[in-house]
Curated annotation (Swiss-Prot):
Pfam families: tRNA-synt_1f
Chemical reaction(s) catalysed: tRNA(Lys) + L-lysine + ATP = L-lysyl-tRNA(Lys) + AMP + diphosphate
Organism: Methanosarcina acetivorans (strain ATCC 35395 / DSM 2834 / JCM 12185 / C2A)
SUPFAM superfamilies in alphabetical order: An anticodon-binding domain of class I aminoacyl-tRNA synthetases, Nucleotidylyl transferase
Family, similarity comment: Belongs to the class-I aminoacyl-tRNA synthetase family.
Enzyme Commission designation: 6.1.1.6
Gene: lysS1
PANTHER family: LYSINE--TRNA LIGASE (PTHR37940:SF1)
Motif ('HIGH' region): 26-34
Family matches, as Gene3D superfamilies: 1.10.10.350, 1.10.10.770, HUPs, Lysine tRNA ligase, stem contact fold domain
Protein's name according to its UniProt entry: Lysine--tRNA ligase 1
Domain of life: Archaea
């Protein structure tokens, strides 16, 4: 049974109506480590729907949190904004409404591309609309009870002047430098003093926010959250989930949500991703490289409590291969496909996203043979036996491959088709050159040749009595030439790319027009560097 179904079954034993929540502070580039939270929430939500639950999925943008520091990606001029809510800090590029939206907009767009469509709630709007007002009044009135819970659970001493509410200074706009000086529950206002020297009064609705350890359980109560994934840092002993459980029960009279604790995504050899440290690959950036369903698969296949190692270089090819094998087994209704694998595939797919038929590795070959020309890509795709009806999805996959080649591809995955016979062809043996000439003669006599057929033809050269073996024999004047297919593949790559290795030969050869191969192999079979110079 898949982990998402286990969760859904567990929570459905308590109630048939559920609100699955996920929330992230858009303080920097929202990376694929954050993506784990949202995809995990989406999987639980979909599992609930599949079991007939009345369920909703929400994403809460914690855009009323303060800017904590001048992050490495920010200019020093942002020092004056440290302590202000990020919804009130200027946009780094100047094109968005504020700092939070600068990072939030591409993230929400990335979610759409992943087939995830939550209701998006912004914390600043919820506070200003008064959704938290009753929770704020309760927290202020029960300040001592909350402080006692925090001390008992976290083991840390709460300062005498601590308050569960952080007022926003009317003068400097900061919420990290103020102290509560008093409050009026009837008027729903809070008096404050600020380190900037200003003092004043703010409304509870939008005039500040609850501290994190109170804000989180208040949110559960206000919205009725029943399921929520969160990182292992929040789940540590004495952490914010432990304090939140008691606060929501004892202060707000609600039950805490079912917790889905997830581990980090480790980025290659660079460790856990963090927006604040710069160890990050944003979801938007990664969607330029990896098909959406493969990114979903990366999360869906692994239990939340296990860490994920992600490397967008060569290991990405292995991940894509793994997913494509699963996809093919599902499409072919392979009897070896178990229920668990089937469920992984179902949850990795989503409506509204492309599901390309063309293998990623094959597109790597096609794209480079086409030299990046999309019209040529379409011709090769069609020649390779794939439908070109869904041009949008083909372009998306081609764009993925283009960015991968540019940013992450290892050297062995890259190649360029030489316009003329490469000088390296001079290093080929007489037998290799004879093979190229014989291969050109053979494929000229045949009609359309598939990638698999090209592959088998090359291998047939080693078989005594095969058509290709006889043609080679005639050219080298040997009754039965002893042929090693490895040397023949080397001859193919050398004559076209000027290197001894290349992509999967069948895909590679079927990407070219047959006329090009015939001409190139014949020229290579008689290549003389002195005559060519």
């Amino acid at each position: 049974m898949h982990w998402a179904d286990v969760i859904a079954e567990d929570v459905l034993n308590k109630s048939g109506k559920h609100l699955v929540a996920t929330g992230i502070t858009p303080s920097g580039h929202i990376h694929i480590g954050n993506m784990r939270e949202v995809v995990t929430a989406d999987a639980a939500y979909r599992a609930l729907l599949d079991m007939g639950a009345d369920a909703r999925l929400i994403y809460i943008a914690d855009n009323y949190d303060p800017l904590r520091k001048v992050y490495p990606f920010l200019p020093e001029s942002y020092a004056e904004h440290v302590g202000k809510p990020i919804s009130e800090v200027p946009c780094p590029c100047g094109d968005c409404a504020n700092y939070a939206e600068h990072f939030l907009k591409p993230f929400i767009e990335a979610l759409r591309r992943l087939g995830i469509n939550p209701e998006v709630l912004r914390a600043d709007e919820m506070y200003r609309a008064g959704l938290y007002t009753e929770a704020i009044k309760t927290a202020l009135a029960k300040r001592d009870e909350i402080a006692k819970i925090l001390e008992e659970v976290s083991g840390k001493t709460v300062a005498e002047d601590w308050s569960p509410f952080n007022p926003r200074c009317n003068e400097c706009g900061k919420i990290t430098t103020t102290k509560v000086a008093g409050f009026d529950l009837e008027a729903e206002t809070v008096d404050y003093v600020c380190a900037c020297g200003h003092s004043g009064t703010v409304p509870m609705a939008g005039g500040g926010k609850l501290t994190w350890r109170v804000d989180w359980p208040a949110r559960w109560a206000v919205l009725g959250v029943t399921v929520e994934p969160f990182g292992k840092d929040h789940a540590s002993k004495g952490g914010s989930y432990d304090t939140g459980k008691r606060i929501v029960r004892e202060i707000y009279g609600h039950e805490p949500p079912f917790p889905i604790v997830y581990e980090w995504i480790m980025l290659g050899k660079r460790g856990a991703m963090s927006s604040s440290t710069g160890v990050v690959v944003s979801i938007s950036d990664m969607l330029e490289v990896v098909p959406p369903e493969v990114l979903r698969y990366l999360i869906i296949r692994t239990k939340p409590e296990k860490h994920i190692q992600f490397d967008p270089g060569q290991p990405l090819l292995n991940l894509v291969d793994e997913y494509e094998r699963l996809r093919d087994k599902f499409r072919e209704n392979d009897p070896s496909l178990g229920d668990f694998e089937k469920r992984i595939y179902e949850l990795s797919r989503a409506t509204g996203i492309c599901h390309p038929e063309i293998p990623f590795k094959q597109m790597v070959t096609i794209y480079q043979v086409a030299r990046g020309d999309f019209e040529q890509v379409l011709k090769i795709v069609k020649r390779s036996g794939f439908s070109t009806e869904n041009e949008k999805c083909i372009r998306e996959l081609a764009d993925n491959v283009s960015r991968w080649l540019e940013l992450y591809a290892p050297p062995f995955a890259k190649f360029s088709v030489k316009e003329k016979v490469p000088v390296q062809t001079a290093t080929l043996s007489e037998l290799q050159k004879a093979f190229l000439g014989a291969f050109a003669d053979l494929i000229e006599t045949k009609g359309k040749i598939s990638g698999e057929e090209y592959h088998m033809l090359v291998y047939s050269a080693k078989d005594e009595g095969s058509e290709l073996n006889r043609l080679i024999a005639q050219k080298v004047n040997v009754p039965v030439p002893q042929v090693d297919p490895k040397d023949l593949f080397k001859a193919i790559y050398t004559s076209i790319l000027g290197q001894s290795s290349g992509p999967k030969a069948g895909w590679f050869l079927s990407s070219f027009e047959k006329g090009f191969l015939i001409t190139r192999f014949r020229e290579a079979s008689t290549y003389n560097p002195e005559k060519s110079s």
